[in-house]
Regions:
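Residue-level signal for inorganic ion chemistry
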Residues: 52, 122, 156
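Amphipathic alpha-helical interface segments
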Residues: 126, 140-150, 154-173, 187
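Divalent-cation-assisted or electrostatically stabilized phosphate/pyrophosphate-binding catalytic cores
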Residues: 92-117, 166-183
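Alpha-helical scaffolds flanking conserved acidic
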Residues: 63-76, 137-143, 202-208
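Histidine- and acidic-residue-rich, metal-dependent catalytic cores
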Residues: 22, 117-131, 144-150, 185-193
Length: 220
């Protein structure tokens, strides 16, 4: 099967996984929150991060579907970042992927909460992964937090905000992008390798492939 065909299958699988996960909450008292979350989460996108997670899992020798909890989790984190990035206090964007942004439909307060919930729910989903080495769950959670948090994606957004009034050097641009965009892609690849039961040698090779990262990522 070609990479294009596998990518299409990966994309469809993670879409179904995310829909199934949130279907259980449709009758919850806070259903308006879930509507806001699903509006952005299931509103299209290339699903590059899940594709990386699935492919690295496959390359390490296990059924690629074993990476589904991690693949879904990184897409949830990515979506939260887009919702918050579009807010008036950030980029103040009215449209995303050809549709009105989350806060334009549901209001700023609900958009903030939808992003917050996606970020925290991502860890709940990731915890469902069945790993060949259960001790790797601590590594996986640490990678997610590091790459999404202040050393990674959030830190990159801060640097982006701080730099808006001046011209950046090439190195500064690369640093921002490696954190704001690259860090979560790094995490997706590493999480896929973990789900695939990667040997220490395979895991190190994965880290070399995804370098640079906010800081060295190692197994616990």
């Amino acid at each position: 099967m070609s990479l294009d065909s596998r990518s299409r299958e990966y994309r469809e699988y993670v879409e179904a996984y995310l829909k199934d996960f949130y279907a259980q909450f449709h009758d919850a008292p806070q259903k308006d929150l879930y509507k806001a979350m699903e509006y952005s989460l299931l509103g299209g996108g290339k699903r590059l991060r899940p594709i990386f997670a699935f492919e690295f899992c496959r390359l390490c020798g296990r059924d690629w579907k074993d990476a589904a909890p991690f693949a879904a989790a990184v897409e949830m984190i990515h979506t939260y970042s887009l919702i918050h990035d579009d807010l008036p206090c950030m980029d103040n964007d009215d449209y995303r992927r050809g549709r009105l942004t989350n806060h334009k439909i549901f209001g700023e307060g609900m958009a903030v909460l939808a992003g917050d919930a996606l970020l925290t729910d991502a860890f709940m989903v990731a915890s469902k992964a069945k790993l060949a080495r259960p001790e790797d769950m601590a590594t996986a959670v640490g990678l997610m937090a590091e790459c999404a948090g202040s050393p990674g994606m959030v830190g990159g957004q801060v640097l982006d905000i701080m730099s808006q009034e001046r011209e950046l050097s090439e190195q500064e641009v690369l640093d921002i992008q490696s954190r704001k965009t690259g860090a979560l892609i790094n995490a997706a690849c590493a999480l896929g390798a973990i789900a695939g039961g990667a040997s220490d040698e395979q895991f190190e090779a994965c880290l070399l492939y995804t370098s640079p990262s906010p800081r060295d990522m190692r197994r616990s």
